[in-house]
Amino acid sequence: MKFRVVAVGKIKEKYLIRGIEEYQKRLRPYTGLEITEVKDSVLPNKLYQAEIEKVLIEEENRIKSKLSSRDYIIALDSEGSQFTSENFAQQIENLTLEGINQFTFIIGGTLGLSNSLKKEANMLLSFSKFTFPHQLMRLILTEQLYRAIKIIHNEPYHY
């Protein structure tokens, strides 16, 4: 099993980078976690619907250039399914038993993800009804991936 994250934009905050690196390190004995950043689009001062669509399509194209046919694509979106940590771990385990071995999580930029990219995803996943900065979402996702692996392996971490 391998986890991939394709995310729009670069993280500048050192505390987020350190947290993500810590969970990547913790995951190494179990699985790989590859994080790929794609360039975010420059947002115009006034966002009209046409400009929003243009930005979303630009970012969609950059994301798609990093995907492969082997990817089981899970797009993070506020409209997605919500799980408990245990249910999320069970979903990952069940999909693995079905033969899925590469999970690719997509995190959009400031404007989220295009509708067409969300439709093409195998699953839409929401961590909360709250809106989080996309940079922080990477840290939350990597922690939940580590938690899911520990649950799957029946090892202490999640209580």
Curated annotation (Swiss-Prot):
Coiled coil: none annotated. InterPro entries: Alpha/beta_knot_MTases, RlmH-like, tRNA_m1G_MTases_N. Its EC number is 2.1.1.177. It catalyses: pseudouridine(1915) in 23S rRNA + S-adenosyl-L-methionine = N(3)-methylpseudouridine(1915) in 23S rRNA + S-adenosyl-L-homocysteine + H(+). GO terms for cellular component: cytoplasm. The keyword Methyltransferase applies. One of its GO terms (molecular function) is rRNA (pseudouridine-N3-)-methyltransferase activity. Its main location: cytoplasm. It is an enzyme of class 2 (transferase). S-adenosyl-L-methionine binds at L76, G108. Keywords: Cytoplasm, Methyltransferase, rRNA processing, S-adenosyl-L-methionine, Transferase. It is found in: Cytoplasm. Pfam families: SPOUT_MTase (PF02590). Homodimer. NCBIfam families: PRK00103.1-3. Belongs to the RNA methyltransferase RlmH family. Specifically methylates the pseudouridine at position 1915 (m3Psi1915) in 23S rRNA. This is Ribosomal RNA large subunit methyltransferase H.
